[in-house]
Amino acid sequence: MLEFKDVSYSAGGKDILKNVSVTLDDRFSAITGPNGSGKSTMAKLIAGIIQPTDGRIFMDGVDITDMSITDRANAGISFAFQQPVRFKGITVKDLISLAAGKKTTVSEACSYLSEVGLCAKDYINREVDGSLSGGELKRIEIAMINARGTKLSVFDEPEAGIDLWSFNNLIKVFENMHERAGGMIIIISHQERILNIADKILVLANGGIVDYGRKDDVFPKLMDVRSGCYFTKN
């Protein structure tokens, strides 16, 4: 369970999040809203990349507000960036071992790659460099998160910068993660297909919460108001 209590965040004289209070308690939650609504800021606050100006953040009842990124990672929080980092000179197997916190066998690493739809023999010894596409990198990143076995996995707009074929594969990966999830998954996204596989949807606009509830209640309203009138929180 993740809880925001009166959380605000300001930068450069601008209020980006304003007194946000919400409890995310389902296995798979999606956060959506127009550009500049505070979605990515909320994700970075969860991961500890930035600290709130005001308010507190709790995970499973523990105050994590002042924890560093490392401490949050050790507490079971993982974060996937919009653009995964490339590591020249490090193989996919090495990266999975680093994520798992132990030396993984070839069989174990191959299992994690297979879970995200990658042919293990084609990737296990490849370097995580510019030869990999955006879609391949994102799936390798998800394999790392699965290897780590985190309590809370946060994905910031995972569909960004990938082609349609890679996106379709990514949807299948998230559907499988949803079915097998041992922890919470939070995805920041605009994509209807991602929103449609969430348990709950949180809608942000102008730094505040417009709506939050079960997917079956919130999703139809989002589809009816793509003109923008839904996102009118002052």
PLM ranges: what are they?
Residues 2-4, 15-19:
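Conserved structural motif at the start of ABC-family nucleotide-binding domains
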Residues 32-34:
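The feature captures the beta-strand-to-loop junction immediately N-terminal to the Walker
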Residues 47:
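Helix-to-loop junction immediately C-terminal to a conserved catalytic motif
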Residues 55-62, 108:
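Conserved ABC transporter NBD signature motif
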Residues 63-78, 222:
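ABC ATPase NBD coupling module
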Residues 83, 89-105:
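Q-loop/switch helix immediately C-terminal to the Walker
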Residues 154-158, 165:
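Walker B catalytic motif
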Residues 208-231:
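Conserved beta-strand-loop-alpha-helix hinge in the C-terminal portion
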